[in-house]
Amino acid sequence: MSTRRINTANATTREELADALQAVFISELLEPSEPLWVITPWISDVEIIDNRTGRFTGLFPEFPQRWIRLFEVFLFLLERGGSVTIACRPLEHNRQFRVKLLKEAKDRGFESRVRVETAEDLHEKGILTSKVYISGSMNLTYNGLRVLEEQITLDNSPAVVATVKINYQE
């Protein structure tokens, strides 16, 4: 894959998106990026990794046998030495997630590896790892993942990943 586009117009393509996001986050847990960038105006503690059948227990024995939520994925990532940079709007909707993540990171001694920025006019959406860039219209919310029709692009071109990383660092 260099570039893959997903339009979530129906249940099948929404599952394709869920599978792609799950794969990206599993990959991150195995080999964390420095940092993982999550740019989304709206963010919620959505279900990201489906471990209800225990299929990831061999890789992650600490995973409970249920859906693993975004907040937990970030904590698992920090426990593995990764870092996370989140940009979102300063909305009340996002506040609980931001505050909870920053508090938990501080309590566990990971505060230097979590950065949360807010911008009132933020509209861009993207997830950037060291290997893939996901962009499009989707917020990291239940509606963005499971309800609304979204257009998403996954790109693992090293040139694209490097360019986006430079842009995000600025």
Model-derived segments and spans:
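PLD/PLD-like phosphodiesterase catalytic module centered on the HKD motif
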Residues: 1-170
